[in-house]
């Protein structure tokens, strides 16, 4: 981490990249969604720990993004990531460009946001846990992914 150097310089900032999967359990992509949830919680914790040192920490949570990730996930990654990529393509969630995600993320960071969900329609993923039970969310996401894994 670069925290010690930031403290020496009187402050700094970190943008960690989470995902809309940070907010939901995603069966058949469990390691991916769990790791992105970790990024969100870790960032929240270190933001609090270093707030008095003038260090800003934000978690950027994009949805599907049109990037090389989709190609790499299709060619070299686990079945779970291939499945996640396929679902995002089918749902039309790979439409946001990397440039748009970066621009929205930097704008949010400059406004001192603690986290930011990029793209149109992606905020709904963060709100689902507020209106649906965990069991219902797991069933919904599991049913979507199960169909792809079975292929």
Language-model segment annotations:
Residues 1-10:
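A short helix-coil junction within the Rossmann-fold of NAD(P)-dependent oxidoreductases
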Residues 5, 24, 45-55:
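Active-site-adjacent segment of SDR/Rossmann-fold oxidoreductases
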Residues 19:
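Residue(s) in the substrate-gating loop at a strand-loop-helix junction
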Residues 26-30:
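Active-site loop immediately N-terminal to the catalytic Tyr-X3-Lys motif
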Residues 35:
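Active-site helix of classical SDR
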Residues 38-50, 60, 69:
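Hydrophobic alpha-helix immediately C-terminal to the catalytic Tyr-X-X-X-Lys motif of short-chain
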Residues 52-120:
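SDR active-site lid
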Residues 112-144:
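A transmembrane-helix-recognition feature enriched in membrane-embedded lipid enzymes
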């Amino acid at each position: 981490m670069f925290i010690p150097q930031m403290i020496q310089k009187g402050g700094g900032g970190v943008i960690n990249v989470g995902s809309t999967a940070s907010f939901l359990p995603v069966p058949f992509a469990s390691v991916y969604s769990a790791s992105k949830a970790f990024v969100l919680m870790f960032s929240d914790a270190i933001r609090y720990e270093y707030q008095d040192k003038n260090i800003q920490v934000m978690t950027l949570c994009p949805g599907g993004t049109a990037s090389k990730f989709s190609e790499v996930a299709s060619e070299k990654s686990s079945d779970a990531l291939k499945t996640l990529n396929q679902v995002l393509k089918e749902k039309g969630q790979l439409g946001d460009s990397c440039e748009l995600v970066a621009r929205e993320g930097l704008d949010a960071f400059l406004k001192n946001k603690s986290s930011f969900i990029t793209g149109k329609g992606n905020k709904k993923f963060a709100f689902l846990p507020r209106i649906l039970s965990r069991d219902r969310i797991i069933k919904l996401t599991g049913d979507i992914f199960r169909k792809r894994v079975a292929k």
